[in-house]
Amino acid sequence: MGVVNVTPDSFSDGGLYFDKDRAVEHALELLDQGADMVDIGGESTRPSARVMVRSRTEVDELVNSDLASTTSMSRAAVSEPEELDRVLPVIAAVRRAKPDALISIDTYKAGVARKAVEAGAAIVNDVSGFRWDPAMIKTLAELKCGAVLVHMRGRPDQWRNLKPQADLMLVVKRELSDWTEESVRLGIKRDRIVLDPGLGFGKNFEQNYPLLKRLDELHSLRFPLLVGASRKSFVGRALAKDGHDRPVGDRLFGTLAAETVGISKGAHIIRTHDVRASLDTARMADQLA
């Protein structure tokens, strides 16, 4: 899964593909490099990012509208119209250039998910685990699309203050189980769900390493697994020198090592910014398995 950030402030590329034409070019390049799918996102969820979380009352008022209101969001969050303006032209252009391309939309907003799938996306990748927008589960059930449920603890602006967990894998496994069962009960087909343990999402540096090493414990939930370690902070911390984390743009080899562990533990999908390198790594890891 190749990453395409149509944002001005993502931690990994800092707006390199905020221009829509460049984003389309990059998506097509990743597909040409061998990506099975591209994940297109229009809002950063980097640490300290502000995001919109709707109450169920607000959703009840908005769910029948064509495009949900933006009055409840943080001033720093990306509005639905703005997010749609970023991603829809890219999705449409990729679909025109490569009609058979598999496209994922990276969003936690049900309104964006619906419009993106109507424009040609086949998968919704929700970093909130379908938790931030109460309309998301109903929307995904209606759309009958693929759904990536990501484990996240709290919101990005809360991560620094989260209480530590003695055994975070047990928490992640229990919550993923609860969230998937709720999603299935509310209408999402089991065979459309992929689970992501959410490396870096509400976990501190020390917690990410055992989560990845123990990834195989999630197989008991009986869903395909996605791993997204690409360029993340815990990679930079592992490669730190003289007290300074490795810069984002120089984390490739650490990323590949993390992805190799993920593959060895049974990951089905690798979400990456560096498709060619990750694909070579995956092929070699498969040969040695």
Question: How would you label these PLM feature ranges?
Answer:
Residues R56-E58:
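Charged/polar low-complexity intrinsically disordered segments
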Residues N5-D9:
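Short polar catalytic/cofactor-binding loops
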Residues M1-G2, E29-G42:
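N-terminal glycine-rich anion-binding loops that anchor highly charged ligand groups
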Residues S10-E29, T45-M52, D66, M73-R96, ...:
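Active-site-adjacent loop and "lid" segments of alpha/beta metabolic enzymes
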Residues K189-R192:
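Short acidic capping loops at alpha-helix termini that bridge into adjacent secondary structure
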Residues L199:
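Acidic helix/loop microenvironments that form the catalytic cleft of cell-wall polysaccharide enzymes
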Residues D60, S65-A68:
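Short, low-complexity intrinsically disordered segments enriched in A/P/G/S/L with frequent Arg
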